[in-house]
């Protein structure tokens, strides 16, 4: 007779494998429908219904196949201000179990003044979600990014990864890059980037970044509650563990690891705007049926990225909900790392800029701005904020408003707060 714990573990693994089976089956059904309606013989019996079935199959196969694949960065080159094309080579600067420090190396280019570390969210999507952000910064900056790994591919032997580990990763990456680095945190990592900087302020002051730009993140979720924060308060930790956490199945290297599955996260993302997504896929099927769709059309470019989801470790998800949203440890300035209090007021020499979107329905205006009230040791001359009119959550780090309004503000902010300290010798390869 199995022990209760063994039965529970098998239940969690069975649920994980069941979701993967459903995804795989839908991909197969789409591929089968597309193949069956593509036989030349079907042309002998012209029927609009066959075109619709073929289109449904093509869209379905593509959509479900993208859910388990990490997108490429697809940044082979960019055009600089002189109209010259520059090649781009993504290089791993620092490899770790749960994420790498990635540098977008530009061969033959003189090193740029601004060294930027983008802290990418670990919230269901890959760091490639910031592709357009990276591309927009390349002409003026040496760009680095946190490239987080899919938890399903990380063996259990690698250990845990929670909000404290995330904070320590950011601190290590900042140490590696040196004090002339400008940290730009986007959405979910905002409170942890603030904590990592405060951690360095006490443990290694010379490694603090020159500036810290915080874009639309939940420093104080209760400052302006949204559906996301309301959900965090409406469920208990026990309910979250029971309904959201599963164990990776036998198909992947992380077999047995407790995770918040990417497929489950995706279902939550889609349910928030179900009508909008249903309309988008219906319209795309119609375009494919009329032979008006393309491999790189607007729909495919967006959904190839949106549907590509990754598992996050259970302890990271649960500790984020409990410590950032429920207990508000960052907002109350009582966050700890390895038992040591991280005091945000210890930040005294790092310029901080807040970016928020007026129509942000994920991290509402005010949630990120709360960081400035915590920085009691920082002079007002080193504090700045910007509320972008009409911008939603994604609009503050991608799209037209980012390119035309927000990006120039950040570049100017970095220029005004640059440090001339020589680069860490260990990073001499950062010159591009």
Say what each PLM segment does.
Residues 76-154:
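Short, surface-exposed "cap/lid" segments of acyl-processing enzymes
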Residues 153-155, 165-182, 194-198:
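Conserved acidic catalytic loop of the alpha/beta-hydrolase fold
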Residues 361-367:
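Conserved alpha/beta-hydrolase "acid-adjacent" motif
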